[in-house]
Every structure is written in C-alpha cells, then in structure tokens.
A protein has these predicted regions:
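Conserved ABC nucleotide-binding domain
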Residues: 32-33, 90-108
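H-loop/switch region of ABC-family ATPase nucleotide-binding domains
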Residues: 164-165
C-alpha cells in the first residue's frame, strides 16, 4: 500500500535517506554510511517513480552524462566513440534509438521512464532498484517494459528489486515477493 515505506527503504539502500538502526550490506560491503556516488560505484543503482532526466538534453546526452566517467567534465570533453555506441545500443534496447537526438523533455512519460532505465544500464549495475517502473505508463508500453526487465535480469545478470502496485507486472517479474505496510514486512513468498 501507499505510505508503507517502500520508497524510503530504496532511499536508505542507496544512501539518500539515513537509517535509524541496523546496517545495509551490499556485496559484503557496509553501505549505510557511504555517500550516494560511492554506493553507485559499487553497482547499486536506482530509478525513480518520477523520472530524473535532463529535459533540455537529448537522449544520447542524457546517457553520456549519466555514465560514471562523466564527472570529468563531460560537457567540454571529447566523448569516446565506444561510449556513444554503448549509449545508442542501450537506447535501441529500450526502443528509443529513433528518438536519440530528441530532447528528453519532448518524450512521453513512458519514454522518459525507458530513458531513465537506459541511463541506469549505462553504468552496468549489479543490482537495479526500480521504483514503480510502470506507474503512469500506457498499458501497451507496460508489456515492453516487462519484457526488457526480464531480459535485463536473465541476459545481463542484473538483480532487480522492484516496487510495483500492478499485480500483472509483479507476477510477470517476481521470483520472490515482499509485502510492506507501515515500515514493517507483512509477508514474503
């Protein structure tokens, strides 16, 4: 249900929300005290219910600026060809190749969600936390998102942790389900 603490849990896992007690271990590393960029460099990334994209940049630029190497002056640097090719391949994977030069702000909300997913994949995460990846999406696009998420898990070996209210999506994706309410786990299976 809404307000059960799911997004807060994700925020705590990636370091944007402090935890009150306990610890968060990822790949044998305590991450609860680490800054967000350090957690991301370990391979733990997330997407958001409300997308975090750069609306004035085109899709390829969004992909490049999201890459972990971009902190070295992306705007003024010569972009390696292989990085641009990787960005375009991922845009193709999510179905946005034809829109790669379009400003991200001109994409539909569903396309912006796909762009954000591709941006996360640019950094080859080990685990990807997805906060309601199909919320507000056209029903015909939902099946495409499900198919891509299954492929990300099976073909790329990326573990997915998904917050989702759509039971069709949950049943299509989940190998294990946890149900939270008011910050407590009610059930798992």
């Amino acid at each position: 249900p809404n307000g059960s603490g799911k997004t807060t849990l994700f925020n705590s896992i990636v370091g944007t929300h402090p935890i009150d007690q306990g610890s968060i271990i990822f790949d044998n590393t305590e991450v609860s005290e680490m800054p967000v960029p350090a957690v991301a460099k370990l391979g733990l990334l997330r997407t958001f219910q409300q997308t975090k994209i750069y609306t004035k940049l085109n899709c390829v630029e969004n992909m490049l600026i999201s890459h972990k190497a971009s902190d070295s002056g992306f705007i003024f640097a010569k972009i390696p060809t292989d990085l641009t090719e990787k960005a375009e391949n991922l845009l193709n994977f999510v179905g946005l190749y034809q829109k790669r030069n379009l400003r991200a702000g001109d994409l539909s909300f569903g396309q912006q969600k796909l762009l954000e997913l591709a941006m996360a994949l640019m950094n080859e995460p080990e685990m990807l936390l997805l906060d309601e990846p199909t919320a507000g999406i056209n029903p015909t696009l939902i099946n495409g998102i499900i198919d891509r998420l299954i492929k990300i898990n099976k073909d790329y070996g990326i573990t997915l942790l998904v917050i989702e209210h759509n039971m069709k999506v949950i049943m299509s994706l989940a190998q294990k389900i946890f149900c939270l309410a008011h910050g407590k786990m009610l059930a798992e299976g």
